[in-house]
Amino acid sequence: VRDGYIAQPENCVYHCIPDCDTLCKDNGGTGGHCGFKLGHGIACWCNALPDNVGIIVDGVKCHK
């Protein structure tokens, strides 16, 4: 279990629309909020995500 910016499979962030709390909870986390991730912009930060849910890997660009 860890905290982090939840990632799409291409190492792209989920933007904060409509909100992050539901997205994080639907993926097994305890909740979430909007944050700013340098190089990605406004993104969803999740608390206590399971290890099998991807989080943003620093230094790897979004390749969508």
Swiss-Prot record:
Organism from which the protein derives: Leiurus hebraeus
Function text: Alpha toxins bind voltage-independently at site-3 of sodium channels (Nav) and inhibit the inactivation of the activated channels, thereby blocking neuronal transmission. This toxin is highly toxic to insects and mice, and inhibits the binding of alpha-toxin to cockroach neuronal membranes.
Principal localisation: secreted
Listed InterPro entries: LCN-type_CS_alpha_beta_dom (IPR044062), Scorpion_toxin-like (IPR003614), Scorpion_toxin-like_sf (IPR036574), Scorpion_toxinL/defensin (IPR002061)
Bridged cysteine pairs (disulfide): 12-62, 16-34, 20-44, 24-46
Protein name according to UniProt: Alpha-like toxin Lqh6
Record keywords: Amidation, Disulfide bond, Ion channel impairing toxin, Neurotoxin, Secreted, Toxin, Voltage-gated sodium channel impairing toxin
MF-aspect GO terms: sodium channel inhibitor activity; toxin activity
